[in-house]
Amino acid sequence: MGLAAPRKKTKISHDPNNTSWSRSTDGFGHRILKAQGWTPGGFLGARNATHSDLFTTASASHIRVVLKDDTLGLGARPKRNLLDGPTGLDAFKGLLGRLNGKSDTQLEAEQQKRDDAKLARYAATKWQTVRFISGGLLVQEKDNATASPASQDLRVDFPRETSSHESENGMFKMEPMDSDSQEGGCATAKEEEGKKKEKKKKNKKGKELDMSSRKSREKKQEKRQKKRKISDCDGLDAETANRTSTNVLVAVANDKGTCLLASNGPATSRERQPMGRRIFRSRHIEQKKRALMDDKSLNEVFIILSH
């Protein structure tokens, strides 16, 4: 560029890698953790935790913040080509190990670890893997029998005292009762008998009341049925009286124009009693029948026809 190029002044700071904050012990977080019992190089959480076996040196190091600039999910790793990595490092590490005086068994163990890591990386890139962190093991609680053996030793089997009513063989004995106890028993028996008699009387009275109420209801129902029957009979008599009339046979002579009227005996045919809305229609039909059966009206009609 020469002398005509723009000049840029760059100043190298005292902490180019920005690691002074991690080494400082004057921060608030460092001081509060120390106050809570944490020591530098220790792990956070309970010391006797169930997952304490899984702690490594990374658990005591600082938290690394990684910028997420892709649309992958949390914890996802992009696929990497295994051929992009450096080749020949395994052989070079083995050569360095031999120069340092390591035995063949140690070299084989290290090589086996490297091969296992390669296989794990290949499987992780080819198939999705899920990493599980154990939260502890289920441990059976101690039973009361094993927890407190001393309490069982303290238990003493006391002999059960036989009552006066129970004999040595387990049979009950009948003791002679005193006169006072006999009188008390008689009084209680009499009271019980009196209560039973009162209950029986109450039950009898209740039954008699029920029977009387039933009889009164039955009588009322019978009276109502009788009234209905009487009213039905009256209506039927009136209808039959109106309906029973002489059957007229009308014969019209075509030549003379005279009519012959003949009457027969009373009709004994029974008709069904109309119900509901058909009552009015039946009345109208009966009026028409009466008009046809009337002698005078028929004669007038036939005279008009003859003229």
From Swiss-Prot:
Molecular-function GO terms, alphabetical: nucleic acid binding
Location within or outside the cell: Nucleus, Nucleolus
Keyword terms, alphabetized: Nucleus, Ribosome biogenesis, rRNA processing
Domain G-patch residue range list: 25-79
Main subcellular location: nucleus
Region feature Disordered, mapped onto this chain: 1-25, 144-234
Feature: compositional bias, Basic and acidic residues: 154-168, 206-221
Gene Ontology biological process terms from the UniProt entry: rRNA processing
Bias kind Polar residues: ranges: 15-25
Composition bias type Basic residues, residue spans: 1-11
CC annotations in GO: nucleolus
Family of this protein: Belongs to the PINX1 family.
Function: Involved in rRNA-processing at A0, A1 and A2 sites and negatively regulates telomerase.
Protein name: Protein pxr1
Originating species: Neosartorya fischeri (strain ATCC 1020 / DSM 3700 / CBS 544.65 / FGSC A1164 / JCM 1740 / NRRL 181 / WB 181)
